[in-house]
Regions:
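Catalytic alpha/beta core domains of metabolic enzymes, predominantly
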Residues: 100-230
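N-terminal active-site wall of soluble small-molecule enzyme domains
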Residues: 43, 48, 52-78, 83-119
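Alpha-helix-loop-beta-strand connector modules within alpha/beta enzyme cores
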Residues: 26-43, 92-98, 145-155
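Well-ordered, non-membrane alpha-helical segments in soluble/globular domains
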Residues: 22-35, 61-71, 136-140, 203-213
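Short, hydrophobic beta-strand segments that form beta-sheet elements in well-ordered domains
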Residues: 1, 80-84, 127-129
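A structural motif corresponding to the C-terminal end of an alpha-helix
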Residues: 33-46, 73-79, 212-224
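Short, well-structured secondary-structure segments
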Residues: 9-63
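Single conserved hydrophobic/aromatic residue that forms the stacking wall/gate
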Residues: 1-7, 11
Length: 230
């Protein structure tokens, strides 16, 4: 993004993980292969375990625990997990204390006070706001330096800015990751027939450009940004 910047974290939706959420995961690279690559470049790895419907019985899943253990046992760099479920957050804190937690944008916290309360939670190292809060500058500027350090903006969300069914969309993905037989979500966006395209991102009112980062966000004290669809 910037000449002086470097990637500090890479997040991944691992395939066939019941703890997953947001999108159905897929991939062909092994865990150790990915870990070696991250280590080579000094980049923190994150697991996207943002399923919103997890129950206690799901916490024993062998694959998800093995992935957490692999990241937790890394000695070279601190790794993290993006979570939605408080049940999972508590479990990870107890069993994998070396992993930091990131509050997922799938919580769809569109009310600024709800978002601020999330930022104030000590559980999370970072909080990703709903993209529709990206440019409420009159409120963002009032955050303390400590709070600003925890905010991580999603720069290029492609979903319709006016979406009223975002929570339901994510919930259906959570159900599908749990193996439930349910139909795919039907997108309510006016242009949904053209599909989910990253080429739409720059048309979104919440889009954050390189110039926005340089000229607006960084002078305000924000330094954490994430890119969807890497």
């Amino acid at each position: 993004l910037l000449a002086s910047s470097a990637a500090s974290d890479v997040y991944k939706r691992q395939a066939d993980c019941i703890w997953g959420g947001g999108r159905i995961g897929s991939g062909e690279h092994g865990v150790q292969e990915v870990m070696n690559l991250m280590s080579e470049y000094g980049i923190s790895a994150r697991l996207t375990f943002s399923n919103s419907l997890l129950r206690e019985e799901h916490l024993a899943d062998e694959k998800c625990n093995a992935l957490c253990k692999a990241l937790n046992d890394s000695e070279e760099i601190s790794n993290g997990v993006i979570v939605h479920s408080d049940i999972l957050a508590r479990y990870i804190k107890k069993h994998y204390p070396n992993l930091y937690l990131v509050s997922s944008t799938t919580k769809v916290l569109t009310d600024f006070n709800d978002f601020l309360n999330e930022v104030k939670r000590e559980d999370f190292q970072y909080v990703v706001p709903d993209f529709r809060l990206n440019k409420v500058f009159d409120k963002l500027v009032k955050l303390t330096d400590k709070e600003k350090d925890k905010v991580e903006f999603l720069c290029n969300e492609c979903c319709w800015f006016g979406c009223y069914d975002r929570k339901n969309c994510y919930e259906i993905v959570s159900r599908q990751n749990l193996g439930e037989d349910c139909p795919d979500h039907v997108c309510v966006a006016p242009d949904s027939q053209s599909g989910y395209r990253f080429s739409k991102a720059m048309e979104n009112p919440a889009f954050i450009s390189v110039d926005d980062i340089r000229n607006t966000y960084m002078p305000m004290g924000f330094s954490n940004f994430k890119i969807e669809g890497r």
